[in-house]
A protein has these predicted regions:
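Extreme N-terminal starter segment of soluble prokaryotic enzymes
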Residues: 1-3
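Catalytic beta/alpha-barrel core
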Residues: 6-9, 18, 28-44, 48-103, ...
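Residues at secondary-structure transition points
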Residues: 13, 40, 124-128
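Conserved strand-to-helix beginnings and helix N-cap segments that scaffold or border functional pockets
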Residues: 15-17, 42-43, 180-184
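Catalytic cores of alpha/beta
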Residues: 18-21, 57-72, 76, 96-108, ...
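Short, conserved loop/helix-junction motifs that constitute active-site signature segments
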Residues: 24, 85-87, 141-142
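Glycine-rich phosphate-binding active-site loops on the catalytic face of alpha/beta enzymes
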Residues: 74-85, 110-125, 130, 158-194
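CoA-thioester-processing core
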Residues: 126-140
Length: 195
């Protein structure tokens, strides 16, 4: 099962150091997710990270960064959006509707099935599914190694995702809620949580 870390939706001081430490600890894939932000801030964050990690970074929005920095791919969050014309490379999508999942799997390398549980970072985003629906989707072959669980994922809930047959989990709120970006400067405890 793959572990994907998604950045906090806002930029903060020391973010580059925390991300570099997570890579040093073995993080396989980071999703640079800063919705509605200026691309210059994403560029700045990328320039602060060692180039060795670029192939492990997937970008949401500002898709040109994928080519400019030779990143690991792009991720499309809006189901209605299409890949940039002529795009070649790793492509991921986000889906929140089981009826669309089969088609999205055909059109991408992997799919984040969103709002498995209530979102920790955005409390207004509630779970889209109950356990019975997810079990039925797994039995129907919709949930497999190409589908990653997103939304409310924590270390405790990884077991549920694994039992359902998800190919990976996306951690966001469970990680970033353990660190006060405004007051803490020592992030060793945060890193230790995922060692």
């Amino acid at each position: 099962m793959k572990l994907v870390i998604m950045t906090k939706s806002t930029f903060f001081v020391e973010e580059d150091k925390i991300l570099a430490s997570l890579f040093d600890e073995g993080m396989d894939n980071l999703h640079l997710f800063k919705p509605g932000s200026s691309p210059m801030y994403s560029e700045r964050l990328l320039t602060l990270l060692p180039k060795d990690f670029y192939k492990k970074i997937t970008v949401h929005e500002h898709y040109y960064l994928n080519n400019e920095y030779r990143l690991g791919g792009i991720h499309i969050d809006n189901p209605a959006d299409i890949a940039p014309k002529g795009f070649k490379g790793q492509l991921g999508r986000t889906c929140s509707d089981l009826s669309m999942l089969r088609q999205m799997k055909k059109e991408s390398n992997y799919v984040f099935l969103k709002n498995i549980f209530d979102c920790m970072e955005f409390p207004e985003e509630k779970s889209n599914f109950n356990l019975n629906q997810l079990e039925d989707a797994a039995k129907a072959g919709l949930i497999d190694k190409k589908v990653y669980a997103l939304g409310g994922m924590s270390l405790e809930r990884i077991r549920i995702a694994k039992a359902l047959g998800f190919g990976g989990v996306v951690i966001c709120g469970d990680l970033w809620n353990r660190f006060d970006i405004h007051n803490q400067i020592d992030f060793k405890e945060l890193i230790g949580h995922f060692q």
